[in-house]
Amino acid sequence: MSGRGKGKAQGTKSKSRSSRAGLQFPVGRIHRLLRKGNYAERVGAGAPVYMAAVLEYLSAEILELAGNAARDNKKSRIIPRHLQLAVRNDEELNKLLAGVTIAQGGVLPNIQAVLLPKKTEKKQH
């Protein structure tokens, strides 16, 4: 460094990378975890921002569907059962989380068509 320039102005406040990117998820923490996790020798500046955005989007999507499931069950609090219903009823999320077990999630209500009672036609006289 040659020492040129005035550096940072005295009155300016530091701005987090999350707020710069317009995200709620912590970009700095994700960057640290990527560096410490030995995933690669070096981590680019854009990688943690992109990853934080993806994680935030997926979280928002699941919470939106789980909130709808809670409302359908006339509950105001999301429980693991609502998360399970949200994920398993959504085709893409179910594919993404196919190998994931949600604790206390239960199972989807499903009765095989063969086991359902036969529909008999009423005879008209």
Swiss-Prot record:
The keyword Nucleus applies. Keywords: Acetylation, Chromosome, DNA-binding, Methylation, Nucleosome core, Nucleus. Pfam families: Histone, Histone_H2A_C. The lineage of its organism: Eukaryota, Metazoa, Cnidaria, Anthozoa, Hexacorallia. The keyword Acetylation applies. The nucleosome is a histone octamer containing two molecules each of H2A, H2B, H3 and H4 assembled in one H3-H4 heterotetramer and two H2A-H2B heterodimers. The octamer wraps approximately 147 bp of DNA. PANTHER family: HISTONE H2A. Core component of nucleosome. Nucleosomes wrap and compact DNA into chromatin, limiting DNA accessibility to the cellular machineries which require DNA as a template. Histones thereby play a central role in transcription regulation, DNA repair, DNA replication and chromosomal stability. DNA accessibility is regulated via a complex set of post-translational modifications of histones, also called histone code, and nucleosome remodeling. GO terms for cellular component: nucleosome; nucleus. The modification N5-methylglutamine is found at residue 104. Belongs to the histone H2A family. Residues 1-23 are annotated as: Disordered. This is Histone H2A. It is found in: Nucleus; Chromosome. SMART domains: H2A. It comes from Acropora formosa. CDD domains: HFD_H2A.
